[in-house]
Swiss-Prot record:
This is Putative membrane protein insertion efficiency factor. The lineage of its organism: Bacteria, Pseudomonadati, Pseudomonadota, Gammaproteobacteria, Pseudomonadales. It is a peripheral membrane protein. The keyword Secreted does not apply. Signal peptide: none annotated.
Amino acid sequence: MRKLALVPIQFYRYAISPLMASHCRFYPSCSCYAYEAIENHGLLRGGWLAVRRLGRCHPWNDGGFDPVPPAPSSRTSSIAE
């Protein structure tokens, strides 16, 4: 399911985005952010992170560097230490 959700993002990145002028206020771009978020966090959490990012992409936001948050580590590794 995750790979299926990434197909439209890849299509946008490689077929539509090059035809448009670069308008993204953030680094990485919103499409790269969405791809990485879904890849690292899964469809639900990654999709939610992507929607939140798109909500921040507007003229009143300065933008800048906004990386995908790291995936939560396993709780068992912190208990074992």
